[in-house]
């Protein structure tokens, strides 16, 4: 694994930056879940070796995933936790911190490994998002913006869409989002179960 590989954060959040309530998502959007799976699973087919993406998550995020969907299939799952006795099952990596997780990936999926890493995604929760936003390798946010005022008790740590951060974070064109994702993505607002939401991609220079 190339130690210069960047990090991508993927998150669904309200316009007031709410991301959760009572250790779960306060919305259930099947199309958004499908988008998350496509984005975090996509690997270019022209690679001559087997490649996989990584999903990094905190313990609470891991535990919030229904048992039948754990681990997230077709992706390398890494759980950030200080609980060394946590039983994650075979093939699931654990690490004490974001940097420790990256070191583990460098060691495990080096040039001699039969599996190479394509992209590294940070998928939550709030504490890991904060660590990722502070990390020098984080250069991309795949954001699902939910246009509904929903009560949340957990919030994203940085208001990257606000004017005060416009010199750092830039919203990319939809065509660039599709190019990066590798497939067609609905443009503009989507309505599902009374929720309007939209897919965006934001980047910053490293």
From Swiss-Prot:
GO terms for cellular component: mitochondrion. Pathway: Cofactor biosynthesis; tetrahydrofolate biosynthesis; 5,6,7,8-tetrahydrofolate from 7,8-dihydrofolate: step 1/1. Substrate binds at residues 32-37, 75. NADP(+) binds at residues 12, 18-24, 59-61, 81-83, 124-131. InterPro entries: DHFR (IPR012259), DHFR-like_dom_sf (IPR024072), DHFR_CS (IPR017925), DHFR_dom (IPR001796). Keywords: NADP, One-carbon metabolism, Oxidoreductase. GO terms for molecular function: dihydrofolate reductase activity; NADP binding. It catalyses: (6S)-5,6,7,8-tetrahydrofolate + NADP(+) = 7,8-dihydrofolate + NADPH + H(+). Its EC number is 1.5.1.3. One of its GO terms (biological process) is folic acid metabolic process. Residues 6-204 form the DHFR domain. SUPFAM superfamilies: Dihydrofolate reductase-like. Belongs to the dihydrofolate reductase family. Key enzyme in folate metabolism. Catalyzes an essential reaction for de novo glycine and purine synthesis, and for DNA precursor synthesis. This is Dihydrofolate reductase. It comes from Pneumocystis carinii. The lineage of its organism: Eukaryota, Fungi, Dikarya, Ascomycota, Taphrinomycotina.
